[in-house]
């Protein structure tokens, strides 16, 4: 369990960990998995990107803004997923996942080290019972997750520092998620600054810095 800009997350890198995550959260398995990327190089080696999507990630990386986009996997990246059943648990039926950057220094450092040193993925989910928030406090992750986690990194002060003026009732507990695929999981076409091109990016979930991302 690691702190992020919006709260606490469960991080794991294989099927056993994914199974434990679903069991601990009592969560349904029909949503795209979340893949944490500790570098843009990792992102580009895993996900299919158009020049516009690549530029979007680059801008938010440079501005240190949390961003997650639902994208299809590169064909050559699929073979890097552990052959242990992980694939079925960390992507949806369209073979898409949500690829996330700039989620917070503690987790970013872990994800980068796992990938650069060991070639391991970092799959993630919020560390709270499904449908509930943790309020940015390690005390809010719940007894089930606490009992099943191998390691819990407590950094309530760090989480609070990202949204210091927001009360717990109005603070964001998640990052922005944007779908960059059509109903079949294929990349949307280049938009070229126009509004008539479809399919187009879809804001699936509001979150931290949504005003900056949508500007």
Predicted regions and their residues:
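Active-site-adjacent structural elements in enzyme catalytic cores
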Residues: 1-215
